């Protein structure tokens, strides 16, 4: 492991690879306990999470629903609730995957909020977007989608006295692959410190089908490039990112991209600048 790999892995609190099935189950139990503790500390009984159809939100939701199930069993209090939220922009091209995720999660409640009217209304009011290039406008509006989704989740959480769950993990964090104050905003991040392969392994341990576990990851925020794979944006694969974070050798080109991207996106992982 090179020094910079160790530095980044420590900063992101990257967890070691699962040694075996028992280690995986112990990590699942630890993270479920973490979720339960967050609710106890906040003196709240509701969790809210947006379900995209990808493995990250699927895995976070499975952990959340298990935490809620355990709290109800332990306390006898039926007020504990997990709310899964679908947040499509009109009709999502992979809606069938999102519905398949919901079938696996079996959330206590499922809400759907179409973010398109809000996103379009805001975009129409911003003069700077009227003369921008199509590519720039598409990128900016893509971030508006992510932030609108988080506004919707916090609106539901506020109305139901709940906490919002985030889906960020180490393989996305190192690349700064989230929208600031969008999907990067949350009250708790139960996947933090995990690499992508570990997220998939946890989903698999819950019995999620391989079609969802191994689905090609996509943020799917840009209309001009619908379903664009994360890895196309990264310039490296998740396998390479995972290997880097676990201190394993990666080719020099991938190494340089990961380090440069980590440094360039440092501001996204920090609190706002202050004097």
Curated annotation (Swiss-Prot):
Pathway: Cofactor biosynthesis; NAD(+) biosynthesis; NAD(+) from deamido-NAD(+) (ammonia route): step 1/1
CDD domains registered for this protein in UniProt: NAD_synthase (cd00553)
Catalytic activity: deamido-NAD(+) + NH4(+) + ATP = AMP + diphosphate + NAD(+) + H(+)
Residues annotated for ATP binding in this entry: 50-57, 167, 196, 218
Molecular function in Gene Ontology: ATP binding; glutaminase activity; metal ion binding; NAD+ synthase (glutamine-hydrolyzing) activity; NAD+ synthase activity
NCBIfam families associated with the record: nadE (TIGR00552), PRK00768.1 (NF001979)
Binding partners and assembly: Homodimer.
Protein name from the UniProt record: NH(3)-dependent NAD(+) synthetase
Lineage: Bacteria, Pseudomonadati, Pseudomonadota, Gammaproteobacteria, Pseudomonadales
């Amino acid at each position: 492991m090179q020094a910079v790999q160790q530095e980044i892995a420590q900063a992101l609190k990257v967890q070691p690879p699962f040694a075996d099935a028992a280690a995986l189950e112990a990590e699942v139990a630890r993270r479920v306990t973490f979720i339960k503790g967050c609710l106890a500390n906040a003196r709240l009984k509701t969790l809210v999470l947006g379900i995209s159809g990808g493995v990250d939100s699927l895995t976070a939701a499975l952990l959340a629903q298990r935490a809620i199930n355990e709290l109800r069993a332990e306390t006898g209090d039926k007020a504990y609730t997990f709310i899964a939220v679908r947040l499509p922009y009109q009709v999502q091209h992979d809606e069938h995957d999102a519905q398949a995720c919901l079938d696996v999660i079996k959330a206590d409640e499922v809400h759907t909020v179409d973010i398109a009217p809000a996103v379009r209304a805001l975009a129409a009011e911003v003069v700077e977007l009227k003369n921008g290039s199509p590519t720039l406008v598409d990128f900016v509006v893509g971030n508006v989608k992510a932030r609108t989704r988080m506004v919707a989740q916090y609106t539901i959480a506020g109305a139901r006295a709940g906490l919002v769950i985030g889906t960020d993990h180490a393989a996305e964090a190192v690349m700064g692959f989230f929208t600031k104050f969008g999907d990067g905003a949350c009250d708790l991040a139960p996947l933090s410190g995990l690499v992508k392969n570990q997220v998939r392994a946890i989903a698999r341990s819950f019995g999620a089908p391989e079609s969802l576990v191994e689905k090609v990851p996509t943020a799917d925020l840009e209309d001009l490039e619908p379903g664009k794979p994360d890895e196309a944006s990264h310039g490296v694969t998740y396998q390479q990112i995972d290997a880097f974070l676990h201190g394993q050798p990666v080719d020099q080109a991938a190494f340089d991209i990961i380090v440069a991207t980590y440094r360039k996106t440092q501001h996204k992982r920090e609190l706002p600048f202050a004097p």
